[in-house]
């Protein structure tokens, strides 16, 4: 295990072991190799002391070089900095409980169900994108800033347990949205949102537009 230092602060622990890897992209992987590499990241820091994942610029969207396949654990926060690029998390056994913060103009893509572990919050800064990529994820609070967006493809499912706030146009796609708890406040219309929405008994959704939840059915 090695300490991960960031600006002089111990923000995470990294575990290494032998593992099977591939190279290239998801569509054009070049076979399997046995390598000694990163297998686990334990998040420690929160807020300004959170671990920041940076994207390598200029690579294809599905490049494995911008994918974190190691298991992510711990109670710290995770920040994604990928201006104009995409970072993905692809380990379905992730269990981290801290917040997930996608910084301005960055995209975070799920490569597996539950890739965000048991994150207590997903916070999308201006023009940031969370791409569920046909996967399912449960989160605590959801915050979607101006011009940011949660992109839910056909078989995607997002469960929000603790409400939150969504700006106009912040929801897109035709998967499933489950509001399980808290109050989700949606400001403005989401004309590109065609998902089925389920509002559980302990939850509420507040909208100020007839298209706040798009144009599909709403169940309660």
Segments (PLM) and residue ranges:
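Small/flexible residues
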Residues: 5-8, 12, 21, 81, ...
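Surface-exposed loop/turn positions within long extracellular repeat scaffolds
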Residues: 40, 44-45, 65-75, 86-158, ...
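FAD-dependent flavoprotein oxygenase/oxidase catalytic domain
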Residues: 76-77, 82
């Amino acid at each position: 295990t090695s300490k991960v230092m960031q600006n002089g602060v111990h923000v995470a622990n990294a575990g290494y072991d032998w593992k099977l890897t591939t190279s290239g992209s998801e569509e054009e992987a070049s076979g399997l190799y046995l390598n000694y590499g990163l297998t686990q990241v334990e998040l420690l820091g929160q807020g300004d002391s959170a671990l920041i994942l940076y994207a390598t610029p200029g690579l294809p969207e599905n490049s494995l070089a911008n994918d974190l396949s190691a298991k992510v654990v711990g109670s710290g926060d995770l920040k994604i900095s990928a201006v104009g690029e995409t970072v993905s998390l692809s380990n379905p056994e992730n269990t981290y409980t801290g917040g997930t913060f996608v910084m301005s103009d960055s995209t975070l893509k799920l490569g597996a169900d539950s890739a965000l572990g048991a994150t207590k919050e997903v916070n999308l800064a201006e023009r940031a994108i969370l791409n569920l990529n046909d996967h399912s994820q449960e989160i605590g609070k959801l915050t979607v800033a101006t011009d940011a967006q949660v992109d839910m493809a056909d078989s995607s499912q997002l469960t929000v347990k603790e409400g939150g706030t969504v700006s106009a146009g912040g929801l897109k796609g035709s998967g499933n949205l489950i509001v399980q708890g808290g109050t989700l406040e949606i400001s403005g219309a989401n004309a590109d949102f065609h998902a089925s929405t389920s509002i559980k008994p302990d939850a509420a959704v507040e909208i100020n537009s007839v298209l706040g939840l798009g144009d599909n059915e709403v169940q309660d």
